[in-house]
């Protein structure tokens, strides 16, 4: 189980990765000359160096002199970076980006970035050379991660597993002993029908047992259970209360799926996309609902940079709420009399001139930092949890547009 400190560290690392990814997505090459390499943690660095050497040799066949030179320079730069690593890359692997990016007016500049230990392990080695950097696998790692239990069943077979983020993990399966329907009448048919119902009931109990064994130990972490199969079967299963009552309470959707083998788990996830999207937003909605309740019902809420900063410094903030769309820097100023003040500006803008509100003197900039990293640093020191809030719903938009993308739920009222 991760500690609060680990969670904060992970949030910070994810945000730092997200910033780099946004930067990389803006870059364009004038041709297929931007190189991306994904290296899993179990891939020997020497193997990667050999692969790069081979690619460098093959790049000599590129007809365009400029593209040929740029690709080979990018490969050389990546090869130089790999000299700093031992036999294997760091935990979770490493992703390297290098290439000549366009700066306008026909000019280019060489950019090289290395991202060590991404949020999840790199799954496989990938070499990519194109007009843009390959960031999709990293973006998938940074996507909201839910944990959902999956059940697909008909009267012949069943499979249960997990949906972890975007990854489906089949875990258990079962085949039934339910016989086909009897066509003839008479007492033997009635007896057969009774035995068949008993076999169906036994199979449903077996499936529920698999699901209960897998999901109940994770009941405090699970975001929901999805059930799929033909209409009569899944409805009978759910209506029969076979699942543990704590699982029955978190069934968030049932869906018609044609297959009930392992591929049926993937079909179930595809069918549940709308429900899964709603579940991701629901957590953010709950945070914002609590924020507005605190805001309207008393003084245990704060918003805006300066009030939130002051409350953070006091250790009064339980949860720091930051908009996912916040893209600003904080500039710290100090006047000749030692008064310190802060100004939040668009990160694309230059430092504005600042006059001290206390003494009216011109102030000098002493620091400029990403506002999210600045606030998260204080939050980490004060044991405050940080939550990133989506703008895909009304109150999430309000946080960004009306409250400057910064708010907090307080542990106690401070009057600030």
Swiss-Prot record:
GO terms for cellular component: cytoplasm. Keywords: Cytoplasm, Protein biosynthesis. It is found in: Cytoplasm. GO terms for molecular function: translation release factor activity, codon specific. It holds the Pfam family eRF1_3. It comes from the Archaea. The keyword Protein biosynthesis applies. Its main location: cytoplasm. The keyword Cytoplasm applies. InterPro entries: eFR1_2_sf (IPR042226), eRF1_1_Pelota (IPR005140), eRF1_1_sf (IPR024049), eRF1_2 (IPR005141), eRF1_3 (IPR005142), Peptide_chain-rel_aRF1 (IPR020918), Peptide_chain-rel_eRF1/aRF1 (IPR004403), Ribosomal_eL30-like_sf (IPR029064). Directs the termination of nascent peptide synthesis (translation) in response to the termination codons UAA, UAG and UGA. Heterodimer of two subunits, one of which binds GTP. Belongs to the eukaryotic release factor 1 family. HAMAP family: Rel_fact_arch_1. This is Peptide chain release factor subunit 1. The gene is prf1.
């Amino acid at each position: 189980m991760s500690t609060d400190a680990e969670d904060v560290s992970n949030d910070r690392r994810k945000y730092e990765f997200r910033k780099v990814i946004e930067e990389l997505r803006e870059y364009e090459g004038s041709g297929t000359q931007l190189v991306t390499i994904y290296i899993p943690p179990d891939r020997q660095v020497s193997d990667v160096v050999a692969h790069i050497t081979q690619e460098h040799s093959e790049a000599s066949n590129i007809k365009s002199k400029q593209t040929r030179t740029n690709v080979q320079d990018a490969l050389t730069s990546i090869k130089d970076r790999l000299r700093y690593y031992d036999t294997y890359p760091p935990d979770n692997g490493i992703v390297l980006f290098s290439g000549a990016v366009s700066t306008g007016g026909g000019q280019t500049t060489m950019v090289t970035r290395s991202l060590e230990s991404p949020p999840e392990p790199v799954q496989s080695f990938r070499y990519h050379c194109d007009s843009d950097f390959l960031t999709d696998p990293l973006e998938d790692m940074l996507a909201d991660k839910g944990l959902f239990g999956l059940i697909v069943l008909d009267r012949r077979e069943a499979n249960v597993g997990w949906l972890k983020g975007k990854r489906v993990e089949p875990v258990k399966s079962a085949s039934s002993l339910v016989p086909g329907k009897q066509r003839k009448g008479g007492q033997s048919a009635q007896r057969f029908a009774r035995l068949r119902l008993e076999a169906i009931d036994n199979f449903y109990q077996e499936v529920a047992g698999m699901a209960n064994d897998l999901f109940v130990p994770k009941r405090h972490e699970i975001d929901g259970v999805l059930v799929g199969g033909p209409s009569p079967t899944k409805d009978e299963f759910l209506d029969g209360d076979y699942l543990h009552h704590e699982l029955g309470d978190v069934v968030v959707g049932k869906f018609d799926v044609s297959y009930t083998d392992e591929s049926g788990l993937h079909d179930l996830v595809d069918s549940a996309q709308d429900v899964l999207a709603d579940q991701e937003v629901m957590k953010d909605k709950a945070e914002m609902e609590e924020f507005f309740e605190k805001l309207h019902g008393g003084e245990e809420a704060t918003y805006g940079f300066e009030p939130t900063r002051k409350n953070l410094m006091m250790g009064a903030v339980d949860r720091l709420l930051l908009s996912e769309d916040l893209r600003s820097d904080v500039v710290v100023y100090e006047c000749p009399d030692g008064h310190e003040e802060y100004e939040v500006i668009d990160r694309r803008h230059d430092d504005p001139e600042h006059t001290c509100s206390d003494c009216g003197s011109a102030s000098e900039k002493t620091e400029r930092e990403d506002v999210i990293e600045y606030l998260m640093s204080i939050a980490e020191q004060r044991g405050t949890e940080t939550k990133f809030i989506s703008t895909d719903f009304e109150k999430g938009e309000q946080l960004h547009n009306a409250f400057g993308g910064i708010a907090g739920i307080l542990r106690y009222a401070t009057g600030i």
